[in-house]
């Protein structure tokens, strides 16, 4: 479908990293001199605890503050030396060593995380996980009341280690499925769940990080969830109940990660047969999405509040005076992309349920949205692709009835907020801003487009034209269509797309979805808008983006502007009559042609379709298209082969139909 799916592992690209944990040193060593950092490595083996602890802390500070120094240390065996220090006899040294590894994983990402994994970082970490769980169990059972200063100090250090380990697990969990498999085998979710029980009196910062790690490690990890529940059934259910209570927690990060964890478990019940009975057996899941959506909506600020949140952490004059590389983003800012991600995933699941479609079956072929073939009612021998049912004809206990109100809520409460976020980001585009703020704006932009896209497709899927909600959706779709060309597509003519390449693909899908409700009334676009978009897509867009754009042309082409129709018609035909047509593009172009030129009464049919000789060109292209279909591997590309065969069958009927239509 045109919607962006929930991306069940791996990975949600550009997800914001957890906040860094810098060491206690700021400028005790010259950060601009990488060679000055090298002696710190030898001090990691110093017999004095204070020396080892100081060295770890200093290295942690270099990792977070000095790129040159960090790379210099990495070239000299930093990772192995820090992993060795996790087994240090001193808990204070372990705190600093795990903190340094935490910063290193954040700064260097995938490559260093995989290096840590290959160097067996999980082995010493698991030893500490066992110690932490044992201490927490003793505390909750009253066996360790932390009466002495030493006990409280040790407990504080263990909490710091737990936070650092949780942060490392977040980053390791974003690497590969193999790493996830090993983490499952080591019962990592059991460890994280122990950090969430309030009786343990864990600091909030540790809980936030543990929740984020739990969220990451339950994302598309059905095996891990099943193992966790099977190995600790009663405690797992207790944890789920506790996570539900966190929905009303004061911390916005606690709320969003708690909802994310429950969503991951909830979703598993629909896509994994082994989890289905587990989810159905937990009554709290019955009203999960209706309860979670308003909470998530409240976490999304208004346009003005969003602007103020950015200004609170970034002041241009102050920033250039301090000359810091990065800003510390507030929790209120960090929660926005996570919230958008969750709403997008929930919306995708709701649409899958409404369509009666298993989300897993759509992962590889998510481009296709059911086509409107109502114009071909007289063509009885054409394969009808539109098999969507009308809500009023469905029993009240079907997903469509239950999802109507949820999608309506998103239309009224989520969409108006989300559409403003890119505008705020563009206000800072002319300024020289810190790199992490720039990355943040890009992620929020990508998440915004994805969220708008999924809500839009759900509105198309759930609302019927006779409903008042569809009328509101139609108005909103028109505004989004204008917004697309006036904001995110504004600088395409200069070759500038402000977000990721995946974001552009999703934007093309969004254009497709919002053009569907009112194809005959589109008056907001110009020939320049369309030609610029076509040129940019052909030079910068992926095949997936181009195919979604062709899908959009199936609606945009039905506007009353003959010049626009002529431009779109040329583009669609070029994909079909090519000497060696690309099947993905050809199939989508054919379906759009059926939509646009299905009736000779359309004002553009005679001057464009008939006048340009498209009918004869389609007839001439038939042999090449048949050969194209035969080349599609039925085993590797089953869905594409099916759609291509269907489009080819429809084309033959369409050609006969148009000949008969013109002869009448």
Swiss-Prot record:
The gene is syo2. It comes from the Eukaryota. SMART domains: ARM. ARM repeats lie at residues 77-119. One of its GO terms (cellular component) is cytosol. GO terms for biological process: protein import into nucleus; ribosomal large subunit biogenesis. Signal peptide: none annotated. InterPro entries: ARM-like (IPR011989), ARM-type_fold (IPR016024), Armadillo (IPR000225), Nuclear_Import_Ribosome_Adapt (IPR052616). This is Armadillo repeat protein involved in nucleocytoplasmic transport Syo2. Belongs to the nuclear import and ribosome assembly adapter family. GO terms for molecular function: unfolded protein binding. Keywords: Cytoplasm, Nucleus, Protein transport, Ribosome biogenesis, Transport. It is found in: Cytoplasm; Nucleus. Pfam families: Arm. Nuclear import adapter that specifically recruits the two functionally and topologically linked ribosomal proteins rpl5 and rpl11 (encoded by rpl11a and rpl11b). Guarantees that this cargo pair remains bound together from the time of synthesis in the cytoplasm until delivery to the nascent 5S rRNA in the nucleus. The keyword Phosphoprotein does not apply. Forms a heterotrimeric complex with rpl5 and rpl11a or rpl11b; interaction of this complex with kap104 allows the nuclear import of the heterotrimer. Component of a hexameric 5S RNP precursor complex; this complex acts as a precursor for ribosome assembly. SUPFAM superfamilies: ARM repeat.
